[in-house]
């Protein structure tokens, strides 16, 4: 199963550099406590690393078990 990342904006990017604000925007986060689900890709991991002080990340499994 492909992994997904649950990303939540927990701190406002106001007062931080423009590139960190842009990274938050490109992750799809607009409001505080907003949650987005993204694929677990190296590009997304790099974006998260850049704004790790502003977001909360949780790994989730895609889909359910059909057993």
Curated annotation (Swiss-Prot):
UniProt xrefs under PROSITE patterns: RIBOSOMAL_L30
GO molecular function, one term: structural constituent of ribosome
Keywords: Ribonucleoprotein, Ribosomal protein
Disulfide feature: none
Pfam family of the protein (one): Ribosomal_L30
Gene Ontology CC: cytosolic large ribosomal subunit
InterPro entries: Ribo_uL30_ferredoxin-like_sf, Ribosomal_uL30_bac-type, Ribosomal_uL30_CS, Ribosomal_uL30_ferredoxin-like
BP terms from Gene Ontology: translation
Subunit comment: Part of the 50S ribosomal subunit.
Annotated HAMAP family: Ribosomal_uL30_B
Similarity field: Belongs to the universal ribosomal protein uL30 family.
The name this protein goes by in its record: Large ribosomal subunit protein uL30
Organism: Thermotoga maritima (strain ATCC 43589 / DSM 3109 / JCM 10099 / NBRC 100826 / MSB8)
Gene symbol of the encoding locus: rpmD
